[in-house]
């Protein structure tokens, strides 16, 4: 649900079918505006949230993805010893956010390069941010490149577009 620009509240709600239409109509009658999947995806990226299949999958380390906060280390789980080691010493790659310094829209699968032109990673999610009025994205880069403020290049249609690594989330609601 979207209420005017910069006043956003997105929630997935599960309700019995018998009540769904009444709840929907109540939201609309009170000024809420529906938004589509693309709008929801843009808001997800602005918040730095991962999408399974894009930003994370079964092979993704929660440490590399920046998801240590949702990993319960007091309980046993598959590969706990490996994840604990990564927690202690770090991972080779890290998920980062970046903001384009030039016009362009980063998309999943686009290459990330350092300023010397060396391959350093790949875009996992990207969009044009209406809140920031810039192209933004997330991706994985080698940990030596995963420093807030570092400049990188995103390859968009065979053109190198300068971007700056930034902290997540991209957008902070006021």
Where are these regions (language model features)?
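Glycine-rich, small/acidic residue-mixed loop/short-helix segments
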Residues: 60-174
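Short beta-strand-to-turn element immediately C-terminal to the catalytic PLP-Schiff-base lysine
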Residues: 13-16, 113
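Single conserved hydrophobic/aromatic residue that forms the stacking wall/gate
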Residues: 1-10
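Beta-strand->loop->alpha-helix junctions that form or flank phosphate-binding loops
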Residues: 34-43, 121, 166
């Amino acid at each position: 649900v979207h209420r005017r620009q910069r006043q956003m509240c997105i929630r997935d709600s599960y309700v019995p079918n018998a009540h769904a239409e009444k709840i929907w109509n109540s939201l609309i009658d009170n000024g809420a505006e529906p938004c589509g999947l693309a709008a929801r995806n843009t808001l997800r990226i602005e918040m730095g949230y991962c999408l399974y299949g894009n930003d994370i999958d079964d092979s993704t380390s929660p440490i590399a993805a920046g998801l240590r906060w949702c990993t319960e280390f007091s309980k046993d789980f598959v590969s706990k010893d490996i994840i604990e080691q990564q927690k202690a010493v770090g991972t080779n790659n890290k998920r980062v956010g970046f903001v384009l310094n030039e016009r362009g829209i980063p998309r999943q699968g686009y290459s990330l390069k350092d300023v010397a032109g060396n391959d350093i990673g790949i875009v996992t999610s990207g969009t044009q941010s209406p809140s920031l009025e810039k192209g933004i994205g997330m991706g994985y880069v080698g940990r030596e490149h995963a420093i807030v403020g570092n400049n990188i290049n995103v390859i968009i249609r065979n053109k190198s577009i300068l971007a700056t690594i930034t902290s997540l989330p991209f957008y902070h609601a006021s």
